[in-house]
Amino acid sequence: MLLLINNLILNDVPTPWGLYFQDSSTPNQEGIIELHDNIMFYLVLILCTVSWLLFSIVKDSSKNPLPHKYLVHGQTIEIIWTILPAVVLLIIAFPSFILLYLCDEVISPAMTIKAIGLQWYWRYEYSDFINDSGETIEFESYVIPEDLLEDGQLRLLDTDTSVVCPVNTHIRFIVSAADVIHDFAIPSLGIKVVASPGRLNQVSALIQREGVYYGMCSETCGVAHSAMPMKIEVVSTKEFLTWLNEQ
């Protein structure tokens, strides 16, 4: 574990009572957070407006000179409450679709990492690199049992091996599964890809800062579903090349 060896502790992990996103490390996740914040601003305005209208109606209902039982039709208000929500939904949907398609784009990846989900661990393969035996770099990653955890390691998140990636590099993740449906999800990187048997799904990531990033399988896949974490160490290009030479 390169970052631990260098006494560098940069972990992006869930926090107790956390109600917001983890710090973003990719443009995709930055876009997701920005879209969420912008939409939430307008949703709060809508909530306050609707709440005020409801409160006013209930408060002043007894003073209304026109009893509601005689009001059976109101074309103007019906047009307003039909068109206005539709316009709001379109305004929300337009940037959402743009971000969705941008997140699906894989732009000239410099390297590819394959992630295969199995019950209940992950297998990784660096298909662009070959070791001294003429084989691609491949390893399996298992969760560290609670009784074997060392100081600083996280329960149900730390693994015996880590995916090591260089910083500021376009990386393509190809995700699949060998048995049942899993889900490759790393919140800080804005990655969440379904791992389906017999199908290859892909996503790209440009990780912009060094650190240790954790994720969990986000698809119920059996009794040990909670024991399928993923751990990614992002290091400098020099440290990544050193790690490659050791494989």
UniProtKB/Swiss-Prot annotation:
Keywords: Copper, Electron transport, Magnesium, Membrane, Metal-binding, Mitochondrion, Mitochondrion inner membrane, Respiratory chain, Translocase, Transmembrane, Transmembrane helix, Transport. Its EC number is 7.1.1.9. Its cofactor is Cu cation. Mg(2+) binds at E219. Cu cation A1 binds at H182, C217, C221, M228. Cu cation A2 binds at C217, E219, C221, H225. GO terms for molecular function: copper ion binding; cytochrome-c oxidase activity. The chain crosses the membrane at residues 39-59, 79-101. It is a multi-pass membrane protein. It catalyses: 4 Fe(II)-[cytochrome c] + O2 + 8 H(+)(in) = 4 Fe(III)-[cytochrome c] + 2 H2O + 4 H(+)(out). SUPFAM superfamilies: Cupredoxins (SSF49503), Cytochrome c oxidase subunit II-like, transmembrane region (SSF81464). Pfam families: COX2, COX2_TM. GO terms for biological process: ATP synthesis coupled electron transport. PROSITE patterns: COX2, COX2_CUA, COX2_TM. Residues 60-78 are mitochondrial matrix. GO terms for cellular component: mitochondrial inner membrane. The signal sequence of COX2 is processed by IMP1. Residues 12-38, 102-247 are mitochondrial intermembrane. Binds a dinuclear copper A center per subunit. Component of the cytochrome c oxidase (complex IV, CIV), a multisubunit enzyme composed of a catalytic core of 3 subunits and several supernumerary subunits. The complex exists as a monomer or a dimer and forms supercomplexes (SCs) in the inner mitochondrial membrane with ubiquinol-cytochrome c oxidoreductase (cytochrome b-c1 complex, complex III, CIII). Component of the cytochrome c oxidase, the last enzyme in the mitochondrial electron transport chain which drives oxidative phosphorylation. The respiratory chain contains 3 multisubunit complexes succinate dehydrogenase (complex II, CII), ubiquinol-cytochrome c oxidoreductase (cytochrome b-c1 complex, complex III, CIII) and cytochrome c oxidase (complex IV, CIV), that cooperate to transfer electrons derived from NADH and succinate to molecular oxygen, creating an electrochemical gradient over the inner membrane that drives transmembrane transport and the ATP synthase. PANTHER family: CYTOCHROME C OXIDASE SUBUNIT 2, CYTOCHROME C OXIDASE, SUBUNIT II. Belongs to the cytochrome c oxidase subunit 2 family. This is Cytochrome c oxidase subunit 2. It comes from Cyberlindnera saturnus (Yeast). The lineage of its organism: Eukaryota, Fungi, Dikarya, Ascomycota, Saccharomycotina.
